[in-house]
Amino acid sequence: AIAYPMALPFISMLIPRGPGNPMEQPKDAQGTGTESGIQPQYGVPYGVTLNPFLSPFGLPCKQPAWGYISALDLKTNDVVWKKRIGTPQDSMPFPMPIPVPFNMGMPMLGGPISTAGNVLFIAATADNYLRAYNMSNGEKLWQGRLPAGGHATPMSYEVNG
């Protein structure tokens, strides 16, 4: 099995219903919210805020690494391999170009997809890369730059499928 554990603390707070936090979804509402901030959870007595635990400078209050990609053996419960994934290249809280991306291990929003060819694709980090890994050993096979962060599970097609 493939997992992408995150080691970044988040702060969640229950928010009672009231102005700005209605019980029912407004008729003109678009979408369901964002990854952070207030999560409406319509139909229940409380909403919830979800935000990373950050310093006043906007940086996490825990040292890196924050994100990994790993393979698990479901029969033995062993971690087969575990690699840091993601760079801070496109996710600094203020404009700071980092010319040489270094693999720090960043939080992810999105998931991987695996193929019959034993290749795992993932674009869930905020550093605007799509990456391919060998599922057997975790070796990075390829990475390509995206115009923006993927934050989603890639899609795969089969020729003549």
Model feature map: region roles:
Residues A1-G161:
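Beta-sheet-rich non-transmembrane sensory/scaffold domains
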